[in-house]
Amino acid sequence: MEQWKVMVLICMYGAVKEFRPTEPYMYEYQHTVLNMSEQTLNSQVYPIWTYSYLITLIPAFLLTDVFLYKPLLVFEAFSYFLCWVIFVFGKSVWSQQVLEVFYGWATATEIAYFAYIYVKVPKTEYKSATAFTRAALLVGRFLAYALAQLLIGLNWTSYSTLNIISLVAMTIAVFLALILPGVEWKEAYEKKLEDNNVQGNLKEIVDQSSYMDYLRMFFVGLRHNLMAIYRNPLILKWSVWSALSSCIFYQVTNYTQTLWGTLPESANRYNGITEALVPLLGIPADLITRQLNVNWNRWGDLLLAVGSIGQAGLLFWMSQSHHIVVLYLSYIFYRVIYQLTTTIAQSTLAFSLDSRLFGLLFGINTFVALLLQSILTAVVIDWQKLDIRPQFVVYSCYHLVVAFGFAIIFGIWASRRFFKTSTN
């Protein structure tokens, strides 16, 4: 299949699989329609996604290359399909717990979505391929959330109808995943040889090799890449921040709807537009950050500390406020700050890391973030059994601890610079 057709298909798949209008009103559906309490959802249902995602991530990361990408895409689409089959037909707590297992599987295998296109396009097209595939995800989410807002805000339909619309979209996503062209091991092997700057006639090398040679190259390269990544203290520092920041970000986004749900149902009618605004505001914030001519190796610690303090303040405000507009705006600003700091982290790593290692680093950092989130969930929800508002106080304090750590790092650097300047 021609390259542009593959690009169109994978972007269509990305947009359709993200077209899930249920999501902004997921808690409202489970709480009001299925009659599940906040405590039940908080302690028995939602934590399962974290554990499922954590357990599935490493196998998904390894098997993406072993199974040559497409099977993992189909698995992702089918997992989302099963989620919404359960949303439509499942009414019990047990069914919602099974749903969270499939949801964890789906989110863990999303790594195949980005890996697939890099095999199908030339190295010179990686940047545009990344832009298009990421844009497709944002477009799908925005359209889904905007539609949900329109239908619910105008009282045109019920939460159950949103589930049916999402199920139809997931059915189409399965179809699109199935018709995507597969990847031959020789095609993937040649691409890895090219990415590793192997000299000579690549097609001839591939023709003289076997599938086991391809696997051997993958696993040997994995070991060498792990060693290459964490020898660099700068990469290690930014990876620590990425894991710490992503951990609490996942937790906040997973439980924000529960916090909104503490207010009367009539106040929760703008969940859709709130979620839709996040990617729209995140895009210009991302572009502005990329244009700033700042040495983030020097000033990044200070920015991360200030950003974490801002996020701590927003979460604490959310924990105390009973006004839905305040909760919505605080959530939007929290997400935008996360987008800004994440963009800075990624751009800083880009100067210190071979682009071939981004996927590996992202996978490891995500795994560590999920491991930390699992511990946080176990302590805050399973052990302490905190209600949702005290939970957000804890999350606010978490950000303050992160801010304190990076403020110390910046202080050490600034002190050394000051004494060095004074000495000279």
Curated annotation (Swiss-Prot):
It is a multi-pass membrane protein. It comes from the Eukaryota. GO terms for biological process: transmembrane transport. It is found in: Membrane. The keyword Disulfide bond does not apply. Belongs to the reduced folate carrier (RFC) transporter (TC 2.A.48) family. This is Folate-like transporter 2. The lineage of its organism: Eukaryota, Metazoa, Ecdysozoa, Nematoda, Chromadorea.
